[in-house]
Amino acid sequence: MRFRLLSLLVALPPLVLGAVPSPAEDPTARAALPEFQFIPAAAPAALAPAAPDRADLKAWPRSQGDNASRRYSALTQITRENIKDLSPAWTFRAGDGAANIQCTPVIVDGVLYAPTPGRALVALDAATGRELWRRSLSDDPKSNRLQDAPARRGLVYWPGDAENSARLLVGAGDFIYALDPKTGAPLAAFGTAGRTPLPTGATAAGVVFRHVFVTTGLSGDAFGYDVRTGKLLWRFRSVARGTDFGAETWDGPRAGANGWSGLSVDDTRGLAFIAFGAPRPDMVGVERLGDNLFSNCVVALDILTGERRWHFQDVRHDIWDLDVCAAPNLLTITRDGRRVDVVTSLSKAGHLFVLDRVTGQPVFPVRLRRAPVSTLPGERTAPYQPDPELPAPISRMGFDPADITDRSPEACAFVEAQVARSTHGFFQPFVEGKPNLYTGSRGGAEWSGAAVDVPTGRLYVTSNRVVSKITVIANDERPRDPKFPPSAGETLYAERCSSCHAPARQGLGMVPPLLGLKARMTDAAVEEIIVKGRGVMPPNLVSDAEQRRDLVDFLQRRNQPPSRSGGGGPGADDTPRYFFDGFGFLNDHEGYPGIKPPWGLLNCYDLNTGKILWRSPLGEHPELAKAGMPTTGAHNLGGASVTAGGLVFVAGTADEKFRAFDADTGAELWSAKLPFAGTAAPAIYEVNGRQFVVITATGGGRVGGASGPGDAIVAFALPLPR
């Protein structure tokens, strides 16, 4: 085993691009590199000393719980001993539609605030669920690029100051709204008529520090606004360009590094920690050679100025869609007897890194393994990728044939046949025309992130174990010759589809690409999605039948004007172009994951040591349980919250159950059936001395559920004394 120790640094020096690359990478040169490199851990004495924690740990003013994104409650009324008595206290039904809502409610002074499927924000009496007010934020459909609910993945309450009133800060479409918490009315002094533009679209919950509201954009970048006036104070580009630090790590078109994952704030040091996702386009990097900063990074910014303090990159030149996917968690741990402040980085690759808050240096050594080369002409893979030992990965990137399902002989044979036709391995690049198998595009971790037990330094994170099955195919499509006018279908696409799927059909944020659609979907399947919608896409996008045919023709590349001359696809040069066939998965003949369970997990880490304390299956397939199969776990998207009562609450599974686990042992102590699947992390709060646990339960989206999508919010509590 050969390895090389790197000098002390936050991340490897970026790959600087120069001459035009040769058609294919040299495997011999790659094999000559040391097998391992290491980023050494910071000396314990050099780690940032713990600062006072000023958060009110019994409050829930932000969807992530507090500015540190810990989703922790110090309330203790509900315990391991009485959890069996927990039951629904009230259920709210929005009554304005049915859609997947991914926002954890905010609760302040006995009032709960949450979005609805009908693109409104509601205020409820947190003790009874009675509606107090409702405010629509969908007056301008063109302003909402996702055409879905406001506060997609969170909102925040700011209490105001001596001169300015309290406000709810809500992202919706391409705007940030400031609303009066008492009435829902827009606050006129904020921006124009209560809203201010967010250039790259809203998704994650922002954070307020002093007078600065920090948020991120769906399609990238971070922004600092004056929380009092809505004035834009600064903008940090997540895709480095021009004279930016890291601009040399891109060659060609620059896109991605989306901001849907989330952010957190150190209230003492004035630092914002922001997670940015994968570069674009997904799966193919021939047009974006280099490490592609600040994709797949946690970036620390000075909140008052927006200046970068440090960054830590996980996967470099990502061609697998392995986003750093969740809000960084801020916590305090013990190292060599000292209490120190750290921040986490979670990714779909299954990596969990623990970093010093001030310098970004890792708390535990980071092992990097030599990665294989690509055979795609024009592709340039990073020579090393993370292969961490401590903390152990949530899941291992790649695929091991030893994991093939043994659920039945038929299931095993069906999966073995797929594996025989596929590639797989540690950061295995795509081979043209062959499916590539790896664990990652649905996690590992996901956007729902983790919860922190503040006193102990434990971290609770949900994860998925499903194998992606994705094929990269040569792209022979070329753009329309500008000498000819667009077709009717292209015009419709530009008007109604391009804000989500991007002008060149390459996809945007969480929205998939439509390139190469003719190779993977029939006309009927495309038209069905246009009519019925899918995920966040609304139904009846085009109601006129003739217009639908025009749009399908454009998407399937039929009856279009002549293409621009030039080789290789949609560009004017001869750079090879590719597309991928969508986000497929390795499943058996009955649609179950093609690997051995567990398929979904709740994981507990002790971050003082970096070790896993326990792992418990999360979710089940009821029909398999009835057949006698042990708890399998299931694909999940929801996230956990933890209490001082020793309980971890979590939903997010298609079996539509809400569960509580013992925080010390991982034993499942309680569950309840929801009207629809839970689709966000729960919030914990207290009203008049009574503790509640509330969950958004709408199903739909990637969670699914037999009953969804729906429109419910359900609050649980112990019975009132008789």
Predicted regions and their residues:
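Extracytoplasmic/lumenal domain signature
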Residues: 82-95, 121-146, 162-164, 175-200, ...
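Repeat-blade elements of multi-bladed beta-propeller folds
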Residues: 60-64, 99-120, 147-175, 201-222, ...
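N-terminal pre-domain segments of enzymes
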Residues: 20-76, 379-415, 565-578
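Asp/Glu-centered strand-loop micro-motifs enriched in Gly/Pro and often flanked by an aromatic residue
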Residues: 49, 65-67, 73-113, 434-442
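Periplasmic c-type cytochrome electron-transfer domains
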Residues: 29, 59, 398, 403-420, ...
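Bacterial N-terminal signal peptides
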Residues: 7-18
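Acidic, proline/glycine-rich low-complexity intrinsically disordered segments
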Residues: 60, 68, 94, 108-111, ...
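Extracytoplasmic electron-transfer domains, predominantly the class I c-type cytochrome c fold
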Residues: 212, 271, 483-487, 491-565, ...
